[in-house]
C-alpha cells in the first residue's frame, strides 16, 4: 500500500541540505527518492555553460497520458548572512514554537515538500491517474539561473514534452497564506552605460570633454522618461539607477570615462527590444550634443508575461479561498522568477508560502501553513483531474 509523505518532515530534511547556489548537498536526491517511492520516473539533467558551475536538475513524471499537471520549484537557497544573528542553526531543520526555521524553508523547500506530500495523498485515493503529474526541480534559481529551469525547458521542448499547466511554488503571500496568486511578471533589463570623454586638467576645461557632466544629463533624462501608465494587469514600468562610477583618484583631473548601471522592470506594453530602442535614442542624442561617444551593454533577465485567467486559474483561486477563507488577488507584482522560462512551454501561475521572512535571518514557515498548503495543492489536483 502506498504510504503518504509528511510535508513537515520532508521540508525539514530538505532544509538540512546546505544547498546554497550552486551547491546541491543532496537536496535533489532527497526529492527524487521520495518521488520514486510514489512511482515517479526521475530524469536527472545536468547543465554547465562556459564559466559557470555545473547544475543538477530533475524532471520527474508519473503517468503517460494527457493532461500533464506540473509543479516547478528550486532547492537552491541564498547564503545565511550573519550566522551569529540566527537563533538556531540555519541548516538544522529546527521546529520551534510550531515553526520550522531554516534557510530556504519558505523560498522554497517548504512548497516542494507540500506538493510531494499532496501528490502522495492524491495518488493514495486515485490509483488510476487520468493524466500525468510532473515536477521540475532545479538547483539554479537564486543567482544567474542559466543552467536550471531555462535549460530544462529547452530540453523538454526539444523532446516535444507536453505540459498543460504548471504551478510554481514561489512564496507569493506577503503576510497570510492565501493572499495572492501570481499570474504574470514584469520583464527585467539591466544596462551598463559608459560615457567616453576627453581627460584633462580641471583648469583647462576647453581642452577636455567631461563625461561626468554628460552622464548626469543622460541619467536625468532616462529617469524622467515616462514609459507608460500601466494597465489593468500590470503596474507602470519603472527605471531605477543602481550604480554611478567615475574612477578618478585626483581632484584636479577631468576623467576620461564615467559609468552607470540601471535596471528597468517593464510590463507587457513593451519588449526588451522596444525598451532598448527608447534608451539608445537618448544615449545617442545626448552624446551627439556633447560630441562624446558612449558604450552600452544590456542584460535581459526575462520578458514580461501574463497568464490570462482561465478555468484552471479560477479553480485554483476557489480552492485557495475555500481553504484559507481569503479571496486571493491575481497579481503581477514582484521580481522575476523561473515562471519566465516555463511560460514558453505551458501556462503557469505561482502560489506558495509566505514571503515575509525569505532571505532573512531566521527564515521560517509555520507548521500549520505547511499543512494548509499541502491540502491546497492536494485539492487542486483533485479538481484538476476530476
Q: For the regions a protein language model found, what residue spans apply to each?
A:
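Acidic/histidine-rich catalytic neighborhood of metal-dependent amide-processing enzymes
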Residues: 108-184
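Short beta-strand segments
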Residues: 72-74, 136-138, 166-170, 194-196, ...
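Acidic-glycine-rich active-site phosphate/pyrophosphate-binding loop
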Residues: 80-96, 167, 184-194, 318-319
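N-terminal helical capping/dimerization or prosegment-like subdomains
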Residues: 1-81, 257-261, 275-278, 367, ...
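Metal-dependent amide/peptide-bond hydrolase catalytic core
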Residues: 2, 29, 172-176, 183, ...
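A structural signal for isolated positions on well-ordered beta-strands in alpha/beta enzyme cores
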Residues: 43, 70, 134-136, 295
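Active-site metal-coordination/substrate-binding segment of hydrolases
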Residues: 68-134, 158-159, 366, 372
Amino acid at each position: 500500500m502506498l504510504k503518504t509523505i509528511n510535508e513537515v518532515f520532508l521540508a525539514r530534511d530538505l532544509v538540512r541540505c546546505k544547498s546554497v547556489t550552486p551547491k546541491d548537498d543532496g537536496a535533489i536526491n532527497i526529492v527524487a527518492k521520495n518521488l520514486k517511492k510514489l512511482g515517479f520516473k526521475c530524469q536527472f539533467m545536468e547543465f554547465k555553460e562556459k564559466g559557470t558551475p555545473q547544475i543538477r536538475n530533475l524532471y520527474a513524471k508519473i503517468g503517460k497520458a494527457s493532461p500533464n499537471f506540473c509543479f516547478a520549484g528550486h532547492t537552491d537557497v541564498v547564503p545565511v548572512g550573519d550566522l551569529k544573528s540566527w537563533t538556531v542553526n540555519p541548516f538544522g531543520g529546527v521546529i520551534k514554537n510550531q515553526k520550522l526555521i531554516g534557510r530556504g524553508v519558505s523560498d522554497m523547500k517548504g512548497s516542494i515538500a507540500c506538493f510531494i506530500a499532496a501528490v502522495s495523498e492524491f495518488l493514495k485515493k486515485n490509483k488510476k491517474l487520468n493524466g500525468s503529474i510532473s515536477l521540475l526541480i532545479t538547483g539554479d534559481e537564486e543567482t544567474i539561473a542559466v543552467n536550471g529551469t531555462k535549460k530544462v525547458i529547452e530540453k523538454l521542448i526539444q523532446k516535444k514534452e507536453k505540459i498543460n499547466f504548471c504551478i510554481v511554488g514561489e512564496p507569493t503571500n506577503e503576510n497570510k497564506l492565501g493572499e495572492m496568486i501570481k499570474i504574470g511578471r514584469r520583464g527585467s533589463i539591466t544596462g551598463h552605460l559608459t560615457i567616453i570623454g576627453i581627460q584633462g586638467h580641471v583648469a583647462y576645461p576647453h581642452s577636455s570633454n567631461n563625461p561626468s557632466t554628460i552622464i548626469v544629463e543622460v541619467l536625468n533624462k532616462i529617469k524622467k522618461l515616462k514609459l507608460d501608465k500601466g494597465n489593468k494587469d500590470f503596474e507602470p514600468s519603472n527605471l531605477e539607477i543602481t550604480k554611478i562610477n567615475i574612477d578618478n583618484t585626483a581632484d584636479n583631473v577631468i576623467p576620461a570615462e564615467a559609468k552607470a548601471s540601471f535596471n528597468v522592470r517593464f510590463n507587457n506594453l513593451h519588449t526588451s527590444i522596444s525598451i532598448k530602442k527608447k534608451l539608445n535614442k537618448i544615449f545617442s542624442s545626448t552624446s551627439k550634443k556633447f560630441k562624446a561617444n558612449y558604450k552600452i551593454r544590456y542584460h535581459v533577465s526575462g520578458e514580461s508575461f501574463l497568464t490570462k485567467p482561465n478555468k484552471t486559474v479560477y479553480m485554483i483561486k476557489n480552492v485557495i479561498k475555500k481553504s484559507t477563507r481569503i479571496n486571493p488577488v491575481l497579481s503581477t507584482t514582484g521580481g522575476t522568477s523561473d515562471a519566465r522560462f516555463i511560460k514558453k512551454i505551458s501556462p503557469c501561475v505561482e502560489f506558495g508560502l509566505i514571503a515575509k521572512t525569505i532571505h532573512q535571518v531566521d527564515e521560517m514557515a509555520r507548521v500549520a501553513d505547511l499543512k494548509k498548503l499541502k491540502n491546497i495543492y492536494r485539492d487542486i489536483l483533485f479538481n484538476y483531474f476530476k
